[in-house]
UniProtKB/Swiss-Prot annotation:
Keywords: Cell junction, Membrane, Transmembrane, Transmembrane helix. InterPro entries: P53_induced. Gene3D superfamilies: 1.20.140.150. Regulates cell junction organization in epithelial cells. May play a role in the transition from adherens junction to tight junction assembly. It comes from Xenopus tropicalis. The keyword Iron does not apply. The chain crosses the membrane at residues 21-41, 81-101, 113-133, 150-170. The lineage of its organism: Eukaryota, Metazoa, Chordata, Craniata, Vertebrata. This is Transmembrane protein 47. One of its GO terms (cellular component) is adherens junction. The keyword Iron does not apply.
Amino acid sequence: MASSASGMEEVRSSVLTPLKLVGLVCIFLALCLDIGAVLSPAWVTADNQYYLSLWESCKKAENLWICDSTLESDWQIATLALLLGGAAIILIAFLVGLISICVGSRRRFYRPVAVMLFAAVVLQVCGLVLYPIKFIETVTLKIYHEFNWGYGLAWGATIFSFGGAILYCLNPKNYEDYY
């Protein structure tokens, strides 16, 4: 009798649960949003006179745009490094989560994926808090400026990463209460 109970337990732990699948979708969305945020040309805009991304800063002088690299400023390099580091960890977590679907014993991958996602969230939050603080401190614009969709995509990626981490932390033994 004990052997049949342990056999049932083994079958139950190898079934893919919907929350883990939703968690994997959250990780994929976070990865897509991170790619969009890093490649976005619009992190800060100012009345069609100024654009700032993670890679370049462009100012409009009369009818001509003058662009400079932002990789000369230490805070912009730090922001880029934090976001790329977080995106790399999210990519690894996604690959581990995807591989865990293909492997029979999935439960051993849940905790590492959750830990990686929480680490990525910490890195990205640090970068996303650093960016506006240092921008306001160092860049003086005489016109109205706003943080644009690239910055918003990065926050979206961070939120989806956090959601995926929470879903991967949920204990699969308690799922029968929900179904």
